[in-house]
Amino acid sequence: MTDVRNDLGHLLVHTAADIAAMPWEPIGADGVAHKVLWQSGDVVIGLISVAAGASKPEHVHLGAHHHIYLTRGSCDMVGRTVDAGSYVYIPPGVPHAVDNVGPDGCEFLYTYRPLEQPLGTAEEEWGNPV
């Protein structure tokens, strides 16, 4: 990950224009990318974008509480169809994927805190326990 903040306790404001200007970094499967908005130690908050027709393969975070808020589009996640405005909590050890992405793709805000090991790059973690 590039340009990751690691400044717990410091004020940070990303305007909509700042976030729009951040590059999407490809992770894992084709059509899946993310932007890290904030990171301190092992806590990460970011955005994930999944293009129409793409999917985020099933994976599991054995030691991480995973929170997701869908900001755009629709998809299937943990056996449910969710759309913009939906919130999903995924406890540690629960397999999850993003499938059946709507025609406009989907985008979601995520946060998680790995509890078992330091956070590596998305490429190292993709599809593997965190």
Give residue ranges: language-model regions.
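A short, N-terminal "cap"/entry segment at the start of jelly-roll beta-barrel domains
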Residues: 1-42, 123-130
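Double-stranded beta-helix
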Residues: 3-6, 97, 101-130
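Conserved short histidine dyad/triad with adjacent acidic residue
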Residues: 27-31, 38-61, 92-95
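Short acidic-glycine-tyrosine-enriched beta hairpin
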Residues: 77-97
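Solvent-exposed residues in well-ordered beta-strands and their adjoining turns
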Residues: 51-53, 76, 111-113
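Glycine- and acidic-residue-biased ligand/ion/polar-headgroup-sensing regions
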Residues: 62-77
